[in-house]
């Protein structure tokens, strides 16, 4: 067989045969050249076929979910060591009126030794509807804070129509707070939208320390209603979503959680404005939600606690941050043991709650902080901080009984009921 007998190269062979003699190229050279082209073409077709039959199975960051090969102690905890008050829950937003779901979670509370849970979803001025939802037999176990509806019947496309920009809005809020307390409301909640997305009539962002809201802060102090305030968010949420961002995987799934860009205030600006409010109202107790949004920087948070005696903190959805710095976190919890409340951002399933107990009560190493896989708030594991019993009791309930006076009766009744059930 020669090159002329290979159909795919017959044309090429005829060209070479016609012009090769003029240049002194032999038939053997023509044959070898044809054969080499044939081999290359066959290799290309083979590679293409392999690629088609065996697609790339290399893991991506989205699918990377390694199983640890560490062989370390795993303490199995199914309930807290002491009775717990959880000050940060969202039964309204999560259950959306589903009584069955709420009742199921009350069962989870009982099995985990959460004797009282505070829901932050009641709307100021219409709190009775939410109180009815979480009540109906659960009055001893569930309590509520209210939050302010800045939008009302208005349209965000026309900020002048928003409730917060109507004449007498602050005065109305003050009056509603007084009524809410008589109905059993225990405090006021501010969401992170206050400072990040709530608008003035001219379309500019409302500043957290705007003096027009001073009567609200002042009234809470007069009524003994603590203010749980969520300002800003994790530091990574204010950074570009790029290969340097430690929460890239999370933000790539939820780009709307990012506050990077000129349209948002700087994180430091938001926290400074919040701190000015805390300083301006020393008679009002402020609960810094999510460790006052400084769980990545406990040294700075420690300075705030020293500077503002009316500030306490809770760590809902922040064991992911605290548990990756166990030495620093343990020292912080012990140093500020009178200023820390327990919160989860629940309702959560049993497994998520068990990670809270392991984090606080054990020295377990390198374990998940969430039942979700991959881990949802940073692709890492956490370590336990093994708090002493006297500190655990303060974090679990003693501090909250002091900070939220209206919760004491519920706690005592629920704790007594739990003790009787265990006899």
Sequence positions of predicted segments:
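N-terminal secretory signal peptides that target proteins for export/translocation
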Residues: 1-22
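Bacterial N-terminal signal peptides
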Residues: 26-41
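Active-site gating/metal-coordination segments in enzymes
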Residues: 53-62, 127-257
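Acidic (Asp/Glu)-rich catalytic clusters
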Residues: 76-78, 106-111, 130-141, 176-184, ...
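Hydrophobic faces of well-ordered beta-strands that scaffold small-molecule active sites
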Residues: 85-89, 116-119, 142-146, 188, ...
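Acidic-and-aromatic substrate-binding clefts and catalytic sites of carbohydrate-active enzymes
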Residues: 92-101, 119-129, 151-155, 163-171, ...
């Amino acid at each position: 067989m020669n090159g002329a007998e290979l159909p795919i190269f017959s044309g090429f062979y005829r060209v070479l045969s016609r012009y090769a003699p003029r240049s002194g190229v032999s038939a053997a050279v023509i044959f070898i050249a044809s054969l080499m082209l044939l081999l290359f073409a066959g290799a290309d077709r083979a590679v293409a076929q392999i690629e088609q039959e065996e697609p790339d199975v290399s893991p991506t960051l989205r699918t990377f979910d390694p199983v640890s090969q560490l062989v370390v102690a795993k303490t199995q905890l199914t309930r807290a060591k002491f009775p717990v008050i959880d000050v940060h829950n969202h039964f309204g937003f999560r259950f959306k009126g589903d009584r069955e779901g709420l009742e199921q979670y009350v069962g989870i509370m009982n099995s985990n030794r959460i004797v009282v849970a505070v829901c932050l979803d009641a709307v100021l001025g219409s709190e009775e509807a939410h109180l009815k939802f979480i009540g109906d037999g659960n009055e001893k176990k569930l309590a509520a804070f209210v939050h302010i509806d800045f939008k009302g019947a208005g349209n965000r496309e026309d900020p002048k129509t928003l409730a917060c920009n109507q004449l007498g809005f602050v005065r109305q809020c003050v009056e509603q707070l007084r009524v809410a307390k008589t109905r059993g409301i225990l405090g006021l909640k501010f969401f992170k939208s206050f400072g990040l997305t709530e608008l003035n009539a001219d379309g500019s962002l409302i500043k957290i320390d705007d003096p027009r809201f001073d009567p609200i802060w002042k009234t809470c102090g007069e009524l003994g209603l603590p203010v749980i305030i969520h300002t800003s968010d994790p530091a990574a949420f204010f950074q570009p979503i790029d290969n340097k961002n430690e929460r890239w995987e999370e933000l790539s799934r939820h780009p709307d959680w990012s506050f990077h860009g000129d349209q948002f205030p700087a994180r430091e600006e938001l926290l400074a404005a919040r701190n000015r409010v805390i300083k301006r109202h020393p008679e009002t107790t402020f609960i810094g939600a999510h460790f006052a949004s400084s769980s990545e920087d406990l040294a700075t948070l420690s300075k705030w606690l020293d500077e503002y005696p009316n500030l306490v903190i809770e760590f809902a959805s922040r064991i992911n941050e605290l548990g990756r710095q166990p030495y620093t976190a343990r020292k912080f919890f012990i140093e500020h043991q009178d200023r820390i409340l327990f919160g989860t951002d629940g309702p959560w399933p049993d497994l998520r709650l068990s990670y809270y107990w392991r984090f606080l009560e054990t020295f377990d190493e390198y374990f998940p902080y969430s039942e979700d896989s991959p881990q949802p708030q940073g692709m890492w594991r956490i370590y336990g901080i093994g708090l002493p019993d006297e500190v655990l009791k303060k974090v679990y309930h003693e501090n909250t009984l002091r900070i939220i006076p209206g919760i004491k009766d519920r706690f005592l009744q629920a704790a007594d009921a739990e003790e009787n059930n265990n006899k």
